[in-house]
UniProtKB/Swiss-Prot annotation:
Keywords: Cytoplasm, DNA-binding. Homodimer. This is Nucleoid-associated protein FTT_0810c. Binds to DNA and alters its conformation. May be involved in regulation of gene expression, nucleoid organization and DNA protection. GO terms for molecular function: DNA binding. GO terms for cellular component: bacterial nucleoid; cytosol. It is found in: Cytoplasm, Nucleoid. It comes from Francisella tularensis subsp. tularensis (strain SCHU S4 / Schu 4). Pfam families: YbaB_DNA_bd.
């Protein structure tokens, strides 16, 4: 079995480019988290920056604690969506396979 260092380096570079692209896509994405059947919505970027919060006028007469809970739930919903989309777009095994690298299953990487 011949070991081709230049081929390995090309594969590693391709994988690095794919990971960089996935990171850029994540940073540019926006998700919307909601609570109270859509009465509270939070728009968040892939960098976890909250861009906007929308509260339906019908909630303005609600108790302060209820409103705080709904806002927290909407933020948590948005965070969960960012994480779900990040995991899907940066699957290390898929990137490695696309780069022609066969990784053994069961490796626990310190990142996603």
């Amino acid at each position: 079995m011949n070991f081709d260092m230049s081929k390995l380096m090309q594969q590693a570079q391709k994988m690095q480019e794919q990971m960089k692209k996935a990171q850029q896509e994540r940073e540019n994405m926006e998700v919307i988290g909601e609570s109270g059947a859509g009465l509270v919505t939070v728009t968040m970027t892939g960098k976890y920056d909250v861009k906007s919060v929308s509260i339906d006028n019908s909630l303005m007469s609600e108790d302060k604690e209820i409103l705080e809970d709904l806002i927290a739930a909407a933020v948590n919903s948005a965070v969960k969506k960012v994480e779900e989309n990040s995991t899907a777009s940066s699957d290390i095994y898929k990137m490695a396979k696309d780069a022609g690298i066969d990784l053994p299953s069961g490796i626990n990487f310190p990142f996603k």
